């Protein structure tokens, strides 16, 4: 989209390189390859593997893991199938910036040798990680190759997931870049529209059942809403983080189903209870469809998405009533904080001089915010105090996730800055509040927009520690109002 995407979606209007870099280790294997050729490994049961060849290798993630644990699927078969789909898709939609083709196959072989295979929650599940999140041995965007895995990657591997590579993300994950050899990621539902992020596009296109995403001002939820997948941003410190951006973004999950997202989040948070998504007890739910400012207009189909979610919740037995969220100046405060944190963290980068001129200009603005103390903790304290009072009456609040359909898939950042900033404010005014206070929020698909031919969605948000409640309510929505797992 534009520089604006940094404001509303932590750079979610993503761009990718013209061709993903494929890394190849020295080791060779006779296990399944990305060409689709496979050799049955010792100890496999060929007849059972054939029984599983009916699409189980494409997900959902929980099905893949169960089949791998039970010996119905070889994880190499799953990785090979995913690699084939990615290779075909990246000929026209460059979603992956780094595809770890041979490494993924080698890791799949190693997975079969693990003594704990039968208890791994994500055994053999292919996953994508957002660019900028270190994978050991892979180049960092702004410095040398990473020497260790980010905690997110380490936990995914420990749970048996196979990390296929990095999906593309803008510089510093902060804004759209679509110049030169880069191009905007297109929406799998309507290629004329933006996808919101490469991670969401990868999930919606069926390349992977689960992807990691970073959410600084709504990126995971904005992109999930654009692409019709489920996305959740956990509360602050639920998932560990390290490095320059620790504290300014949360590591979230995008998936084709709530079950899969809950499974992945339970792994990232080291909380097995989050994978349990039985219906919640009777909840008090507020429906808040008004935008943070009367100057902002909300597309009626996005308002209808929130109202539909509220109706489904009421039919499920929850107490639902109209409500007014106490936004105050939260969106503006979130923007100022985002600028200040970005400028604060840049010196920690290994090679900050590699940043683009445009990024350096924006970081200079962040330093000005710091210098004049325009972003300070008291702003957050005031907003949080009002929200705590609001949530004395409610367990969950429902809003539209976005206020408009995804923007057109073009190089928005070439447009003049006021135009892009205005577009950003119009797109996603509902998401930044929850980043400012560090509370959990999720985006739940709720149908299609009749004019843009892209999905619409509702946002569910709750107080600190309500991740399980949001997941359970979202799963209940999915059961009563199911959505198509991937784009046609």
Give residue spans per PLM region.
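Residue-level recognition of beta-strand->loop/alpha-helix junctions
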Residues: 167-168, 324, 445
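Periodic, rod-like helical contexts
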Residues: 21-24, 28, 32-33, 37-39
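Residue-level detector of structural "landmarks"
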Residues: 6, 15-17
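Short glycine/serine-rich loop/turn segments
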Residues: 121-249, 288, 401-419
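Amidase signature
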Residues: 36-115, 267-428, 436, 465, ...
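Structural helix-boundary/capping segments
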Residues: 69, 79, 88, 154, ...
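Intrinsically disordered, low-complexity segments enriched in small polar residues
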Residues: 2, 11-14, 36
């Amino acid at each position: 989209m534009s520089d604006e995407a940094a404001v509303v979606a932590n750079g979610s209007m993503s761009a990718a390189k013209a061709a993903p870099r494929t890394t190849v280790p020295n080791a060779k294997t006779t296990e399944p390859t990305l060409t689709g050729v496979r050799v049955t490994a010792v100890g496999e049961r060929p007849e059972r593997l054939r029984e599983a060849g009916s699409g189980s290798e494409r997900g959902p993630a929980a099905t893949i893991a169960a089949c791998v644990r039970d010996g119905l699927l070889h994880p190499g078969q799953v990785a090979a199938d995913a690699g084939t789909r990615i290779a075909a898709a990246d000929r026209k939609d460059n979603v992956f910036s780094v595809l770890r083709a041979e490494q993924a196959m080698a890791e799949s072989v190693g997975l079969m040798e693990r003594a704990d295979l039968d208890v791994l929650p994500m055994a053999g599940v292919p996953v994508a990680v957002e660019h900028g999140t270190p994978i050991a041995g892979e180049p960092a965007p702004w410095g040398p190759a990473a020497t260790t895995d980010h905690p997110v990657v380490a936990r995914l591997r420990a749970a048996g997931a196979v990390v296929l590579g990095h999906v593309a993300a803008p510089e510093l994950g902060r804004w759209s870049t679509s110049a030169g050899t880069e191009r905007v990621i297109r929406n799998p539902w309507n290629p004329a529209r933006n996808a919101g992020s490469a991670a969401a596009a990868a999930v919606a296109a069926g390349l992977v059942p689960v992807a990691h995403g970073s959410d600084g001002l709504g990126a995971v939820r904005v992109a999930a809403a654009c692409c019709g997948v489920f996305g959740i941003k956990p509360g602050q410190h639920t998932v560990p983080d390290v490095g320059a951006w620790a504290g300014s973004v949360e590591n979230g999950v995008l998936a084709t189903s709530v079950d899969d997202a809950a499974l992945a989040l339970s792994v990232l948070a080291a909380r097995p209870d989050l994978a349990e998504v039985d219906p919640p007890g009777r909840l008090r739910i507020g429906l808040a469809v008004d935008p943070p400012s009367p100057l902002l207009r909300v597309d009626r189909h996005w308002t209808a998405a929130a109202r539909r979610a509220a109706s489904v919740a009421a039919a499920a037995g929850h107490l639902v009533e109209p409500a007014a969220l106490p936004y105050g100046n939260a969106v503006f405060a979130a923007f100022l904080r985002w600028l200040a944190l970005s400028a604060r963290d840049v010196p920690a980068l290994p090679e900050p001089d590699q940043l683009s001129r445009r990024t350096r200009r924006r970081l200079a603005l962040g330093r000005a915010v710091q210098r004049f103390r325009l972003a300070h903790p008291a702003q957050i304290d005031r907003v949080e105090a009002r929200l705590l009072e609001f949530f004395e009456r409610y367990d969950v609040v429902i809003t539209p996730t976005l206020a408009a359909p995804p923007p057109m898939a073009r190089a928005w950042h070439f447009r003049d800055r006021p135009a892009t900033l205005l577009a950003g404010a119009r797109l996603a005014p509902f998401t930044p509040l929850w980043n400012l206070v560090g509370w959990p929020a999720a985006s739940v698909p709720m149908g299609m927009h009749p004019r843009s031919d892209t999905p619409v969605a509702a946002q569910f948000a709750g107080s600190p520690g309500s991740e399980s409640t949001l997941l359970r309510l979202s799963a209940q929505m999915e059961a009563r109002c199911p959505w198509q797992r991937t784009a046609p």
